[in-house]
Amino acid sequence: MPAGMSGAAGKTLANFKAPYPEPTSQQRRYVIFLDPKGYRKELNDYKVELIPGRVEKVDGANVYRMGGSIEERTIDGWGYTYYVVTLTTMSGTLMMPLGDAALKRPRFVAMSTNNLYRYNSQLPIVVYTPKDGELRYRIWTVKSTGSGTAKSINAREM
């Protein structure tokens, strides 16, 4: 299956009949459909990390982060949540790059975020980013040993 696709890939936002706002001319809308894991497992053992960012030309020596925020909003009368991302400036460490590391190449620069969101296969995760932004996400799961693992996935624009 291609990256970003899942067993829930046959779903569309129209299946939910909820009036999610259309993206503005300055936005992209990403919709994430999650595979069912069972109610208790979804509630206790799975979380979703949203990783918004932007592709920027950066060197290979420094660590870069994008500033910004993720605002949670609710569709009035429905109770369904969606998220609006604001991206601001990029910051990085100040190491002197040498050799190939000095070459600036396009790379995804992620926004700093610590939030984990509920895994709910019954509803899509709808995220609006700036037009020049991208969205990636990770599914975090708990193993019986108590340690967590994550799988990184590119979100699909819809």
Curated annotation (Swiss-Prot):
Belongs to the protease inhibitor I11 (ecotin) family. Pfam families: Ecotin (PF03974). InterPro entries: Ecotin_C, Ecotin_sf, Prot_inh_ecotin. GO terms for molecular function: serine-type endopeptidase inhibitor activity. Coiled coil: none annotated. This is Ecotin-like protein 2. Gene3D superfamilies: Ecotin (2.60.40.550), Ecotin, trypsin inhibitor (4.10.1230.10). It comes from Leishmania infantum.
